[in-house]
């Protein structure tokens, strides 16, 4: 969420910056609400001053033995008017808050301007795509040849965009997640966290998925079981399946003041992620690239504002190192203003090479959200007895497990349909060096 004081003082510049993101800021709505707010605020202050003055007159009149009934009646009327004005003021504040919750973050000044992915900027590449001396298969053909990826049965169980992984491929998927967790906790200084996969709406508002992207979420309604449950008007508890572990990890510091000496906080979690993929009809309908349920190892850093861009570069490096250890070619893309996520001020995408598609595909997205999420979550830090300040939050995939599996199946395939296990994963696979029939 943007700082409303910044909006009030620099509206034109902010409107221009948001337009670069493709967001048309409702200037007239904001100015109308601001005008009403100022008017009612002035009225409230005037009524409060008059009531205070009248209250003093009562004391003086009583000392002089005068009748105070008329003044008492005036105070009562002013009290009613004041209550009405306060209710109106609260209503306007709520509308302003709702408007703010719909506004995306401001792009950092280093972000290139662009309308869509065509405006993204390639930063660097690592590794050279392998030249195969046979016709490469995609991961679906490889998995089905091995009998270890089953979309048909998954569709019977759940519907489209689900899969069953079996045998060696299922074990490879598990090995990847374990390898990533070990690397991030043992080498990169992250603390592993096991998080709930169901979260309340406050969490999703904090990280920016709500209210704007509710259609992308899977929601669950159940009967209240505990007095701490968030019960709606029907007596039901509304929860959401997490679209990413960023949501529970970042919300660890919601409504919290973190002592300065504890920063940075670095969290990692391996979770399933659930997305409805609304608006993705017809995109990546084949294979594991775009599923309703997929696993991801998520990295979150909570930092001092002056350290967040240094942290972003290190976070990207942590995700890169996984691909380097797996010897998978990739490239780093700096996203343009029109292709960034709602909460991000700056985002790097890491794209891995998929030989069957002869292109690079996103496998990680690493973002600095600056104070945008922290303001929504009221996540702050404090040095000693100083006034609390907003934290900066960062997140990134380290990595998407399913897409890493896809990259290994395709980049490590052999002519006979088998798949070689990357050397670094062989200990996680119990010494298995190849998946074959």
UniProtKB/Swiss-Prot annotation:
EC number(s) stated in the UniProt entry for this protein: 6.1.1.11
Pathway linked to the protein: Aminoacyl-tRNA biosynthesis; selenocysteinyl-tRNA(Sec) biosynthesis; L-seryl-tRNA(Sec) from L-serine and tRNA(Sec): step 1/1
Catalytic activity: tRNA(Ser) + L-serine + ATP = L-seryl-tRNA(Ser) + AMP + diphosphate + H(+); tRNA(Sec) + L-serine + ATP = L-seryl-tRNA(Sec) + AMP + diphosphate + H(+)
Protein family: Belongs to the class-II aminoacyl-tRNA synthetase family. Type-1 seryl-tRNA synthetase subfamily.
Domain notes: Consists of two distinct domains, a catalytic core and a N-terminal extension that is involved in tRNA binding.
CDD domains found in the cross-reference section: SerRS_core
Name of encoding gene: serS
Molecular function (Gene Ontology), one example: ATP binding
Compartment(s) where it occurs, according to its Swiss-Prot or TrEMBL record: Cytoplasm
Pfam families: Seryl_tRNA_N, tRNA-synt_2b
Enzyme type, top EC level: ligase
Gene Ontology CC annotations of this record: cytoplasm
Subunit relationships: Homodimer. The tRNA molecule binds across the dimer.
Residue positions binding L-serine: 244-246, 298, 397
SUPFAM superfamilies per the UniProt record, alphabetical: Class II aaRS and biotin synthetases, tRNA-binding arm
Function, as annotated: Catalyzes the attachment of serine to tRNA(Ser). Is also able to aminoacylate tRNA(Sec) with serine, to form the misacylated tRNA L-seryl-tRNA(Sec), which will be further converted into selenocysteinyl-tRNA(Sec).
Protein name: Serine--tRNA ligase
Binding site for ATP: 275-277, 362-365
Transmembrane segment boundaries: none
Upper taxonomic lineage: Bacteria, Pseudomonadati, Pseudomonadota, Betaproteobacteria, Nitrosomonadales
Keyword annotations from UniProtKB, A to Z: Aminoacyl-tRNA synthetase, ATP-binding, Cytoplasm, Ligase, Nucleotide-binding, Protein biosynthesis
PANTHER family: SERINE--TRNA LIGASE, SERYL-TRNA SYNTHETASE
Entry annotated with the keyword Protein transport: no
Biological process, per Gene Ontology: selenocysteine biosynthetic process; seryl-tRNA aminoacylation
Organism listed in the record: Nitrosomonas eutropha (strain DSM 101675 / C91 / Nm57)
